[in-house]
Regions:
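N-terminal signal-anchor module of multipass membrane proteins
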Residues: 1-59
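Signature of multi-pass transmembrane helix bundles
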Residues: 4, 13-27, 101-102, 106-107, ...
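Short, amphipathic, aromatic/basic-enriched membrane-interface segments that mark the entry/exit
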Residues: 11-21, 62-83, 99-103
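Alpha-helical transmembrane segments in multi-pass membrane proteins
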Residues: 23-31, 46-58, 87-95, 99, ...
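Helix-coil boundary and interhelical linker segments in multi-pass alpha-helical membrane proteins
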Residues: 33-45, 98-105, 147-156
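C-terminal ends of transmembrane helices
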Residues: 56-72, 116-128
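Cytoplasmic-side transmembrane-helix entry/capping segments in multi-pass membrane proteins
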Residues: 73-89, 108-110, 128-139
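Long hydrophobic alpha-helical segments that form multi-pass transmembrane helix bundles
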Residues: 133-169
């Protein structure tokens, strides 16, 4: 009997990180839609800002890291070829973790910059970070703006108006 020892990964799949992250984005669509329906335009703006800032931060990091800021068309093509949707997932998760009462629109921007630049890219990029970048961005926002993100307010009254006594004991 031959014992074969090999390093991980032991299960191999043809699916790439890009495909897996796209599946994660699709799986988060119901939660995203519910957040926008329940909390309105503030949630939609927070989601768009966090996702856009996360992708922009990764793009700027890519430009700085590869020192290719002179040729814009080639830079965009190279970035698009290696883009794997992880920054979109990080931005979306960060936005979904933020409270609904978050009306200071610079907060998801700062959280996304911290999540991508400090937590993800500083440690080597996709798969090499020591903590989840989205949650680290949320913790950064909590530590930096404790009073503004500690007491979220949700208005579920329109949803519960059809069920009298839903919140009573």
């Amino acid at each position: 009997m031959n014992l074969i020892v090999s390093s991980a990964p032991h299960i191999r799949s043809p699916r790439t990180t890009k495909h897996i992250m796209l599946d994660v984005l699709i799986a988060l669509l119901p939660a995203t839609a519910a957040g926008i329906v329940f909390f309105g335009w503030v949630a939609a703006v927070t989601i768009v800002l966090a996702m856009f800032t996360a992708v922009l931060t990764e793009f700027v990091w890519y430009i700085i890291e590869h020192k290719i800021w002179r040729n814009g068309k080639e830079t965009l093509a190279n970035f698009a070829a290696q883009f794997d949707f992880t920054s979109l997932v990080t931005g979306l998760l960060l936005a979904l973790c933020c409270p609904a009462s978050l009306e200071a629109l610079y907060m998801p921007v700062l959280g996304a910059i911290f999540a991508i630049a400090v937590v993800k890219m500083l440690f080597g990029g996709t798969g090499k970070n020591i903590v989840n970048p989205a949650i680290a961005g949320r913790v950064f926002l909590f530590i930096s703006f404790m009073a503004m993100v500690s007491y979220p307010e949700a208005n579920f009254a329109p949803l519960l108006s059809y069920t009298d006594g839903a919140l009573s004991t």
